């Protein structure tokens, strides 16, 4: 598991995916940014509320058990970005920069949205 290997290497949490917005878009169109945020949050909420139905709709086509998918979509995947995860992401960028995989370390700046 990639996350377990990352934890062994760095002692930090791993971020697998993010929703990102261009900072010009975020500053020039805050209402649209809020709308996108609200829709994404709603989709996550709906997905978690209907997790059983979602699993049942795909289980016949997957090589996993119901319990495995339930665990994966439940406590295994974290749906929030805490300071611990941001710290892990910064470490990822720092290591990628040291290995010349990226030219510069990106700034992580969270957009202002109503939660």
Named regions from a protein language model:
Residues 1-58:
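Pocket-lining segment of extracytoplasmic ligand-binding domains
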Residues 57-115:
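An extracytoplasmic/periplasmic, membrane-proximal ligand-sensing/linker region
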């Amino acid at each position: 598991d990639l996350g377990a290997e990352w934890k062994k290497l760095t002692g930090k949490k791993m971020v697998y995916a993010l929703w990102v917005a261009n900072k010009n878009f975020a500053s020039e169109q805050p209402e649209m940014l809020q709308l996108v945020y609200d829709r994404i949050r709603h989709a996550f909420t709906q997905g978690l509320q209907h997790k059983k139905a979602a699993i049942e709709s795909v289980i016949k086509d997957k090589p996993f058990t119901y319990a495995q998918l339930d665990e994966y979509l439940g406590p295994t995947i974290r749906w929030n970005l805490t300071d611990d995860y941001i710290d892990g992401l910064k470490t990822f960028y720092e290591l990628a920069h040291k290995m010349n995989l990226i030219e510069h370390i990106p700034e992580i700046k969270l957009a202002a949205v109503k939660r």
